[in-house]
Structures are given as structure tokens and as C-alpha cells.
Amino acid sequence: MDLKIRNARATDAPFLAWLILTAGRAHVKRGIWEVILNLPENDCLSFLELLTVTGAPHLFHHSCYIVAEVEEGTVSGLGGYNPDTHGYPKLIEALPEVYGKMGRFPIREMAAGEPPRITASIPPSVPGAWVIDSVATIPAYRRRGIVDRLLDNILDIGRRKGYRQAQISIYMGNTPAQRAYEKHGFRLLDEWPDPYFQTEIGSPGMARLICDL
């Protein structure tokens, strides 16, 4: 299989929207974005597509992603970012642009300037860590080692930027994902359980993994 890994571009927005939504579902059926937005799947995808091409960068902006492509097209990807310059505060700043383009109002919590309740279980960034996020592969191309190559690539990017540690968060109970990341040197740091998260997502909460670079 002839595989090319490259930086994502604005034209990858439809694929990145699928990737972010799919990564947010992980091993559960209703993902975190569907809970946050409370919209049908197609509307969630439209929202995420616009989110990846906002004027200002943030953790879900296309500039934070690398993708893998084969002759048939783009098949996998993941994000890596500096939480100090591209973290959640920058995401919040970008949201009005997306809602404006969609012609929708923010959900009640965000309209009041508060984060969505479901985000209370998202672990904070480890100080000084390079953060990996939103990992997903098209089903037909899974179990071919593509994510391994992407992970090696994104960890190397963090290493070259001077980071000494990398972090990734997963849903508690997603054992296959945890084992896959452990093969790359990640280890469980802590867990962030939340009954509300369990009710809405179907997972007890989120787990934070870390590795040395």
C-alpha cells in the first residue's frame, strides 16, 4: 500500500469533520459532539467542517492535523497541538464565526458564556505537554498500521518542537485504544469519571494518558 502522510489543508475540511465526529464517538454510539451540539449527524458534520477552516487557529483547525492518504483518497488522520496557543480558549473564540456562518444560535450554555456540561470530564492539559487529539481511520483501512505511522509522525513533530511529553485522552473503557497507545509509550496518568458523562455518552468518563518524548 502506497501511503503518504502530509499536513492537512483547508480542502480536507469534509474529511476532517468526519474524523472529528468519528473520534468523538470512539467505541460509543453517541459522541461528545452530538451531545454538545444536540444536532442531527449531517448538521454536526456541517458545523465541524466550518470549524476546521475558521480564520483563527485552534485545536480543531485544519492546521493542527496530519492525514494519511492512499491512491483512493484520504483515509486517516489525527491532530497535535500546543494547548497554550491552540487550546480550548482559542476554540471558544472561534465559535461565533461558525455559528454565524450556519445561521444558528449557540447552545444555551455557550450563549451564557459557560462551557457545555459534558466538557467537565475532559481532562486538562498536562503543563508543557504536546497534546494529541481526534484519531480516526476509515473502516476499510483500519488494522493496517496507518495510525501507528501517524502517531510516530505526530510524536516526532512534538519532539522536534521541543516537547518532553505528549498527552492523549480517551474514553474510559476503550481498552483497544489504550493498548494501541501503550505500544507507543503512553501510560495511564489518571481518570476523570462523571455520572453525567456516563448518562449522555455511555462511558464512565475520560482517561488521560501520557508518554515521554
Regions found by a protein language model. Give the residues of each.
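Conserved GNAT acetyl-CoA-binding A-motif
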Residues: 129-130, 158-169
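Conserved beta-strand in the GNAT
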Residues: 67, 73-82, 131, 136
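Conserved GNAT-fold acetyl-CoA-binding loop/helix
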Residues: 25-52, 99-101
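C-terminal "cap" of GNAT-fold acetyltransferases
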Residues: 164-167, 171-178, 184, 194-213
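Conserved N-terminal entry element of GNAT/NAT acetyltransferase domains
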Residues: 1-14, 28-34, 212-213
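Conserved acetyl-CoA-binding loop-helix of GNAT-fold acetyltransferases
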Residues: 143-156, 179-183
